Swiss-Prot record:
HAMAP family: UPF0223. Transmembrane segments: none annotated. Pfam families: UPF0223. Signal peptide: none annotated. It comes from the Bacteria. Belongs to the UPF0223 family. This is UPF0223 protein BA_4171/GBAA_4171/BAS3873.
């Protein structure tokens, strides 16, 4: 990783750890693939931390600028496939 993840310093340490795990899961979806349930579980936790659609879009844009990976596209792909399948971008 040669870049910094978008983090909000108002988040608790636990929330920051969760967000980093979520960003890593998105990277994994693009680089190797990740089991759908693992990604969706982290996405549900992400939505607890970032419930606002506007904030979600802002974070996705910031993450895509630094990593080249789209949170939105990865989650859309995960929603399209069957359970226990690999999400691979």
């Amino acid at each position: 990783m040669e870049y910094q993840y978008p983090l909000d310093y108002d988040w608790s340490n636990e929330e920051m750890v969760t967000m980093v795990k979520f960003y890593e899961a998105i990277e994994k979806a693009y680089e190797k693939g990740i089991i759908r349930e693992e990604l969706m579980g982290l996405y549900r936790r992400f939505k607890e931390i970032v419930p606002s659609k506007a904030e979600e879009k802002k974070i996705d844009k910031e993450f895509q600028e630094v990593s080249g990976y789209s949170i939105y596209r990865a989650i859309q792909r995960a929603k399209e496939i069957e359970e226990q399948k690999l999400v691979k971008m």
